[in-house]
Amino acid sequence: MKHTLSVLVQDEAGVLSRISGLFARRGFNIASLAVGPAEQIGVSRITMVVQGDNRTIEQLTKQLYKLVNILNVQDVTNIPSVERELMLIKIQVNSQNRIEALEIVKIFRANVVDIAEDLIIVEVTGDPGKIVAIEQLLTKFGIIEIARTGKISLVRTSKINTEYLKDKVVAYNA
């Protein structure tokens, strides 16, 4: 099972290197990684997605706490949270299919950030499922390049699960 870990660290040189070294020694692959400043000055948030069962992730968490500069480790996999990714995707278009490509972009509430006669660069943000879905639909146009961030995540203050919210929005709009 994939787990999303949110790790708060002191923003100092070598922290990410020590974390990646721990993962390498244990034979873990980091499927997704995003690092950036947290809400507190001098603290960074690392959001990573790793594969493993609950016991393995618990052991990994204990090992992370043993590293210098680790302030907090939280497995947010089963906690209601907001998850987002960003993808830039450059696709091949022509006069016959440009409108269809732009309609897909519009449906996904994505943005065209660059356009040329035969190429479009699209920026899309959303949960990982949305990113995968638009990528699959745009594949038929010919993908030239993709740049995709790792997943970022914050625990919901409301503690309400996203799936619950989707059901309520659908019922409300019906």
From Swiss-Prot:
CDD domains: ACT_AHAS. SUPFAM superfamilies: ACT-like. The keyword Amino-acid biosynthesis applies. Its EC number is 2.2.1.6. This is Acetolactate synthase small subunit. Keywords: Amino-acid biosynthesis, Branched-chain amino acid biosynthesis, Chloroplast, Plastid, Transferase. It catalyses: 2 pyruvate + H(+) = (2S)-2-acetolactate + CO2. It comes from the Eukaryota. InterPro entries: Acetalactate_synth_ssu (IPR004789), Acetolactate_synth/TF_NikR_C (IPR027271), Acetolactate_synth_ssu_C (IPR019455), ACT-like_dom_sf (IPR045865), ACT_dom (IPR002912), AHAS_ACT (IPR039557), AHAS_small-like_ACT (IPR054480). It holds the Pfam family ALS_ss_C. Its main location: plastid.
